[in-house]
Amino acid sequence: MTATSPLRVVREEQLARLGGDTFDMLIVGGGVTGAYAALDASLRGYRVALVEKSDFASGTSSKSSKMVHGGLRYIEQGNLSLVRHSLLERQRLRRNARHLVQRLPFLFPVMERDGVFDKRLAKAFESLLWTYDLAGGWREGILHQKLTKAEVLSHCPTFNEAYLTGGFMYFDARVDDARLTLTLARTAAFHGAALANHARVAEVTRNAQGRVDGAIVHADGREIRVRAGVVIMATGVWLRDWDGRRKGDAPALQVRPAKGVHVAIPWLKIRNDCTVTIPVPGRNRRATITRWGNVSYLGTTDEDYDGNLDNVYCTRQELDFLLEGARSALKTDLQPHDVVGSIAGCRPLVGPPGGKTIEMRRNHEIHIAPDGLVTIVGGKLTTSRHMAEQTIDAAQTVIGKRAPCRTKSAYLLGAAGYDPQAIVASGGLAAHLGERYGTEARFVSDLIDARPSLLAPIVEGLPYSEAEVVYAARHELARSVDDVLSRRTRARLMARDASARAAPRVGQILKAELGLSDALVASQVRDYVAAVQYEKSVLIGDNG
């Protein structure tokens, strides 16, 4: 599937469709699961609407570890079936979103002591890696490797040599989670779905017989009545606060938010060329350090969270936890002031309180209420396609229709005909745009050809250009400064302070492209800068 012109989703047209059309399926929640469900249903030929109260991927789906993997620890938990299935889904994503999903080497150092595991357990760990390869890791085209001490240091020169004896490397994949989610939503629109971000569902409606028949949506100061044969709640951890059921009805599923944080550090302080797994001293835990552009991001944590789901931040305590592990494993004295960005989000685990969240299985659950409301929650980024398939299968039973799933081999926008090896090898602007837009990169290049001044960088020290902001406004449903700097680009994670300085210019471009008022632009810039400052104050620990 290759578009000959850039997809343009006009907001006014989408809102008019929400109020004027009757849909087979209304999906609430614009994270990766909801976006994949919208694509799945659209490809089956259904009339689909997807609404999101904030921005696409503004919740958990932009704050993951950005890994598309089977998960070695799921083998350790005995969940081999999840690993097999995840590795199969990984390869489907590697094909269908080949411009976004890249191979990611994982390095496990072997230590005499004080490591993720010691030398005595190395043989057992290698058996685990063989199990991983046989479960589906081989589909990546390369099996795990045993490394010498020198080879480990060649991949991460700053690793602490004390007690290091060697290591193992195996191969998975990574993705810009926010761009994947956005691309899924845009591909759904390409196939006919109606999309609206910044559109909040205020109420799930029911007919005289008590059956779900749509929702009331608030967007741009108006109230829109959306009619649909079935409503799917795909709101992730937000199901904890509101799940669309009527007052008095028992909750369908028990959601347990588990908070995870990552912090970004200048890559030159680490100099890793792969994901390095490190121990956290005295915690029986491990963390990872992954290179992404000019930063390496360090994570993650896994703890219960009962706070405000719309305002989740990395705290000083969590930062110290991660830096303690990094300082122990590396010959680099990382300090809080070295951190250039952070993300914090919550995983939507399914289950009751009790026990450690890190030990809970990452399975998903789908529920069909007696009134026809369908709910999906749980799972993980890697298995989102399969979760969506099962969700639409369930929704079909509500509306009494049946059509086969087509997403197993469906290319996302930008993937068909894209040659990642050739584009990345070319380097420079072509490689940067290729890894973000795939074959759609030519549309961004067209903007630059028409107006060369758009090649100007938008954020100091990062490769994003003004052309990408224009493209985000015209073709990627960006409505705010935060949409652009946090998700259409990843400037807030990679260069928090520089992104705040770029906010006024982003606001001016959005004003010109979207016709925003001076007052609204000023408000967006002010809110973004304030949010960045608050994030920083919580991280450093001086927020009172």
Go through each PLM region and give its residues.
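Core beta-strand elements of the Rossmann-like FAD/NAD(P) dinucleotide-binding domain
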Residues: 21-23, 221-230
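Glycine-rich Rossmann-fold phosphate-binding loop(s) that bind the pyrophosphate
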Residues: 29-31, 53
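Glycine-rich FAD pyrophosphate-binding loop
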Residues: 42-64
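A conserved short coil-to-beta-strand element within the FAD-binding core of flavoproteins
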Residues: 197-213
